[in-house]
Amino acid sequence: MPEAVIVSAARSPIGRAFKGSLKELRPDDLTAMIVQAALDKIPELDPKDIDDLMLGCGLPGGEAGHNLGRIVAVQMGMDHLPGCTITRYCSSSLQTSRMALHAIKAGEGDVFISAGVETVSRSVKGTSDGLPDTHNPLFAEAEARTAQVAESEGASWHDPREDGLLPDPYIAMGQTAENLARLKGVTREEMDEFGVRSQNLAEQAIAKGFWEREITPVTLPDGTVVSKDDGPRPGVTLEGVAGLKPVFRPDGLVTAGNCCPLNDGAAALVIMSDTKARELGLTPLARIVSTGVSGLSPEIMGYGPVEASKQALKRAGLTIDDIDLVEINEAFAAQVIPSYRDLNIPLDKLNVNGGAIAVGHPFGMTGARITATLINSLQFHDKQFGLETMCVGGGQGMAMVIERLS
């Protein structure tokens, strides 16, 4: 059975939504640039040999609608190349990598593009979830309960299923973070400390040249070249973030200092069979060892990485002790903290270059972006096995184990 290997990775800088460096770029234009950048790194590959372009997008509507994956293929002059657009919210472009893995293992293709994009700045043109009166009234009581809790103080989380009630599948992500923090006993100070850690580590990694290794500069319509992420801030201190006000509840724990911002960005991987890579004389960057995906209550979605990671590790025949570096997507410190603790991940292996609290989390981009970052990190720190994992809106988790090959 062939192995699935990653032979190229590229990502854009990550812009802040609505006010950042990429706010003028359409999602299709940005994706096409980054897919082309990934292909340019492997000129040995004939584009006619690509079997499918699979694009992850968290909210594929508006400018990101119309089956954006296919739009991008045609835009790039590849009418022969099929394209699909996949949403699994925050893990959309990890899902596309999983699909490439499965297709290669099944013998149904040798070369796939796994890409991801989100341009929240452009969401004013519409998103897949933005239409009024589209929620199923079946969940109206659950939504009302969420709204009531959001306005109250001292609320703890209790699984509504235990009372024979439905959970709220439409719940805002910030409310799930508040629920999980209370359920797992995570304090505001711990969350702030983690947020500061992310920013400080990102600042150090920037100084060492780590992040610039994986970023493909993007040229804007006016000719401006963007080559850095907007999010990292130098000199962030615990004292500086301690005064930030809670965002989601009167007595909330989540602030702008301990969660990710809203962002724009795109990333792309070229995944092929090891036999095809050998045929082309390519040295793979990494091998996809295994993946995992899990579900749990939508109201505590942030805990999803735990079960998904256990799945992926079991399928890989590895334990957490075998993993050299771990990237947990930092949607909220409130979810990273209980996840890494319950997976027994040492902090000196976790998000060692900073994470999404600093660099950002464009939903559909994140899966492929973290894969690119993990490969970069395994190379930079000379390590072998990496685990990528994230929580997913709607109450899910996803994970992937990779092995560095070069």
Language-model regions, residue ranges each:
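Conserved active-site "lid/cap" helical segment
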Residues: 1-58, 62-72, 76, 176-188, ...
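N-terminal extracellular/periplasmic Venus flytrap/periplasmic-binding protein-like
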Residues: 11-13, 24-33, 44, 152-154, ...
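Flexible glycine-/small-residue-enriched beta->alpha junction loops
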Residues: 111-179
